[in-house]
């Protein structure tokens, strides 16, 4: 029942339109406002260890990574790029610092793009013409990756520290040099470890150019801290239409970066939602062990790549309502659980059978969804909500 209060209904919440950008192709992945926001990560292996690097790329691909970056600090790493680029399932970007000759090695190796750091490549300004010519001939884009920790000393001297203005001016200066040589397939990042400074830098940059932007909070920290920093910064920017690719930088296995990145995009409806688990934080009203129940359901549905919302609720306050709103859910109490499927109670089971029943029903619903849309492409990990 709807109660009218004589007030206009607010519009449905939506994000700001994507900021209009020029379009690039990184391998087979489109980048820019005409394409979905993509998730990137970076290998932690030694690039010259080809087998280990390709194994990690395969793991990242399976986790939903769209583009992968590899380090190239030595000649032996540069020598390995061709084989890695040839066998990788997703586009490979070479990450170049200090030595400009590795830029040309990466281009010759068939990498899908090259990231250059103008702050630490010796005499980079004087080599831009050569880089632009080689990249243009190969048809690959260049990412100008400015980082607060390695900002060009000219801009450090001018601004005193890595301010948003310093980061943006450094990036646009280098972009202008490429443009002077007729090369415009450019993507830019201006990373900082402080999310507030990072957001300000990207807002300033977005207002001053039409290049696609790669978002990142650099050196974000361990998994928990880095996840919070990245989610806050990405949410602030993406909700305003700013950002075309993202990389969550964590002191954690790179697969975790991809999981967080995908979840950020799903949370903003910028990527099709996968399995979602909704669960309550628990309180004194809970009549079951919500933590254990939620974790067991999540583990049992791991890898089920269908857009199901599963609600696991611990009491009768919000439990029935949340369970009815989900595709599948349980409202628990008094040692038992009411199982809901698409808003209807289908059975009541003992507490010991809740997890097993939810998993069985989730598998059944997933099979039905597959029959209705056999060509559907899995889009991530299941989401389970426990309340």
From Swiss-Prot:
<keyword id="KW-0479">Metal-binding</keyword>
<feature type="binding site">
    <location>
        <position position="315"/>
    </location>
    <ligand>
        <name>[4Fe-4S] cluster</name>
    </ligand>
</feature>
<keyword id="KW-0414">Isoprene biosynthesis</keyword>
<keyword id="KW-0007">Acetylation</keyword>
<dbReference type="InterPro" id="IPR045854">
    <property type="entry name" value="NO2/SO3_Rdtase_4Fe4S_sf"/>
</dbReference>
<comment type="pathway">
    <text>Isoprenoid biosynthesis; isopentenyl diphosphate biosynthesis via DXP pathway; isopentenyl diphosphate from 1-deoxy-D-xylulose 5-phosphate: step 5/6.</text>
</comment>
<keyword id="KW-0560">Oxidoreductase</keyword>
<dbReference type="InterPro" id="IPR004588">
    <property type="entry name" value="IspG_bac-typ"/>
</dbReference>
<dbReference type="GO" id="GO:0051539">
    <property type="term" value="F:4 iron, 4 sulfur cluster binding"/>
</dbReference>
<feature type="binding site">
    <location>
        <position position="283"/>
    </location>
    <ligand>
        <name>[4Fe-4S] cluster</name>
    </ligand>
</feature>
<keyword id="KW-0411">Iron-sulfur</keyword>
<keyword id="KW-0408">Iron</keyword>
<keyword id="KW-0004">4Fe-4S</keyword>
<dbReference type="GO" id="GO:0016114">
    <property type="term" value="P:terpenoid biosynthetic process"/>
</dbReference>
<comment type="function">
    <text>Converts 2C-methyl-D-erythritol 2,4-cyclodiphosphate (ME-2,4cPP) into 1-hydroxy-2-methyl-2-(E)-butenyl 4-diphosphate.</text>
</comment>
<dbReference type="GO" id="GO:0046429">
    <property type="term" value="F:4-hydroxy-3-methylbut-2-en-1-yl diphosphate synthase activity (ferredoxin)"/>
</dbReference>
<feature type="binding site">
    <location>
        <position position="280"/>
    </location>
    <ligand>
        <name>[4Fe-4S] cluster</name>
    </ligand>
</feature>
<dbReference type="GO" id="GO:0141197">
    <property type="term" value="F:4-hydroxy-3-methylbut-2-enyl-diphosphate synthase activity (flavodoxin)"/>
</dbReference>
<comment type="similarity">
    <text>Belongs to the IspG family.</text>
</comment>
<dbReference type="GO" id="GO:0009274">
    <property type="term" value="C:peptidoglycan-based cell wall"/>
</dbReference>
<dbReference type="Pfam" id="PF04551">
    <property type="entry name" value="GcpE"/>
</dbReference>
<feature type="modified residue" description="N-acetylthreonine">
    <location>
        <position position="2"/>
    </location>
</feature>
<dbReference type="GO" id="GO:0019288">
    <property type="term" value="P:isopentenyl diphosphate biosynthetic process, methylerythritol 4-phosphate pathway"/>
</dbReference>
<dbReference type="InterPro" id="IPR016425">
    <property type="entry name" value="IspG_bac"/>
</dbReference>
<protein>
    <recommendedName>
        <fullName>4-hydroxy-3-methylbut-2-en-1-yl diphosphate synthase (flavodoxin)</fullName>
        <ecNumber>1.17.7.3</ecNumber>
    </recommendedName>
</protein>
<dbReference type="InterPro" id="IPR011005">
    <property type="entry name" value="Dihydropteroate_synth-like_sf"/>
</dbReference>
<feature type="binding site">
    <location>
        <position position="322"/>
    </location>
    <ligand>
        <name>[4Fe-4S] cluster</name>
    </ligand>
</feature>
<dbReference type="GO" id="GO:0005886">
    <property type="term" value="C:plasma membrane"/>
</dbReference>
<dbReference type="GO" id="GO:0005506">
    <property type="term" value="F:iron ion binding"/>
</dbReference>
């Amino acid at each position: 029942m709807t109660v009218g209060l004589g007030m206009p209904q607010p519009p449905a919440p939506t994000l700001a339109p994507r900021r209009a950008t020029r379009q690039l192709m990184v391998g087979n992945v489109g980048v820019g406002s005409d394409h979905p926001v993509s998730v990137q990560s970076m290998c932690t292996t030694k690039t010259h260890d080809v087998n280990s690097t390709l194994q990690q790329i395969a793991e990242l691909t399976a986790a939903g990574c769209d583009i992968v970056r590899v380090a190239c600090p030595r000649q032996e790493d540069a020598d390995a790029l061709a084989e890695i680029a040839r066998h990788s399932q997703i586009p490979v970007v070479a990450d170049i610092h200090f030595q400009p000759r590795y830029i040309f090695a990466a281009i010759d190796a068939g990498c899908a793009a090259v990231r250059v750091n103008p702050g630490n490549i010796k005499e980079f300004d004087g080599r831009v013409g050569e880089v632009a010519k080689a990249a243009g001939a190969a048809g690959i884009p260049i990412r100008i990756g400015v980082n607060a920790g390695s900002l060009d000393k000219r801009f450090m001297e001018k601004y005193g520290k890595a301010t948003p203005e310093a980061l943006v001016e450094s990036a646009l200066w280098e972009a202008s040099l490429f443009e002077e040589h007729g090369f415009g397939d450019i993507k830019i990042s201006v990373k900082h470890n402080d999310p507030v400074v990072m957001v300000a830098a990207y807002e300033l940059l977005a207002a001053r150019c039409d290049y696609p932007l790669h978002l990142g909070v650099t050196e974000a920290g361990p998994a928990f801290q880095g996840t919070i920093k990245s989610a806050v910064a990405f949410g602030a920017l993406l909700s305003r239409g700013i950002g075309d690719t993202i990389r969550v930088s964590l002191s954690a296995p790179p697969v975790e970066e991809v999981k967080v990145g995908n979840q950020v995009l799903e949370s903003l409806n910028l990527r099709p939602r996968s399995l979602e688990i909704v669960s309550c934080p628990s309180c004194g009203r809970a009549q079951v062990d919500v933590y254990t129940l939620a974790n067991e359901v999540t583990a049992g549905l791991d890898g089920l790549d269908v857009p199901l919302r599963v609600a696991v609720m611990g009491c009768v306050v919000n439990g029935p309502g949340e369970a009815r709103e989900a595709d599948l859910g349980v409202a628990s109490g008094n040692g038992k659980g009411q199982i809901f499927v698409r808003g209807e109670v289908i059975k009541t089971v003992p507490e010991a059978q809740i997890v097993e029943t939810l998993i069985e029903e989730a598998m059944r619903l997933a099979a039905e969804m597959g029959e209705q849309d056999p060509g559907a492409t899995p889009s991530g990990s299941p989401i389970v909500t426990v309340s």
